[in-house]
Swiss-Prot record:
The gene is RCF1. Residues 88-160 form a coiled coil. It comes from Zygosaccharomyces rouxii (strain ATCC 2623 / CBS 732 / NBRC 1130 / NCYC 568 / NRRL Y-229). Keywords: Coiled coil, Membrane, Mitochondrion, Transmembrane, Transmembrane helix. This is Respiratory supercomplex factor 1, mitochondrial. It comes from the Eukaryota. Residues 5-96 form the HIG1 domain.
Length: 160
């Protein structure tokens, strides 16, 4: 057994190999509130900039305050998501570790079974070889006895 099957490969290694846009999609799926907060913050900044250009200072100030609040909410979502994702990642790693341990145990049991079968095969070959040798010895003894019998028969015929 050459190693662990591909189903045991960690997903983090495959994330590192993804193209940039695929990484963005992956992380957006992991923490959906962060991109939402980023978009809302960007929208608040755009509306504040538009109100500054038109000269509406009060509305610009309101949108800048919204930007600060949305940015804070985004940071809270980022930290909370990292905490939640980190703990679930640890759980996944422990589950993967259990699966690896189980796979190693299966591999060890399979190797032991193969070794046991190999020993049985060697034992049977040894017994077959001993049986062949015994058969050859018996055949030699039978041929000797047949020769002696013929000699005795010829000796008895000669005496008559």
């Amino acid at each position: 057994m050459s190693g662990l099957p591909s189903s045991f490969d960690s997903k983090e290694a495959s994330v590192d190999e993804l193209p940039f846009l695929e990484k963005v999609k992956f992380h957006c799926k992991q923490q959906p509130l962060v991109p939402l907060g980023t978009l809302l913050t960007t929208g608040a900044v755009a509306l504040a900039a538009q109100n500054v250009r038109t000269g509406n200072k009060k509305k610009a100030q309101v949108w800048f305050r919204w930007r600060v609040g949305l940015q804070a909410a985004t940071l809270v979502a980022l930290v909370a998501g990292s905490f939640i994702y980190g703990s679930s990642l640890k759980e996944k790693k422990s589950e993967e570790e259990k699966m690896r341990e189980k796979a190693k145990m299966r591999e060890l049991l399979w190797i032991q079974e193969l070794e046991r079968r190999d020993q049985e095969t060697q034992y049977r070959r040894k017994r077959a070889e001993l049986a062949r040798q015994k058969m050859q010895e018996n055949e030699a003894a039978v041929s000797r006895l047949q020769k002696e019998l013929k000699d005795l028969e010829s000796h008895i015929k000669n005496e008559k």
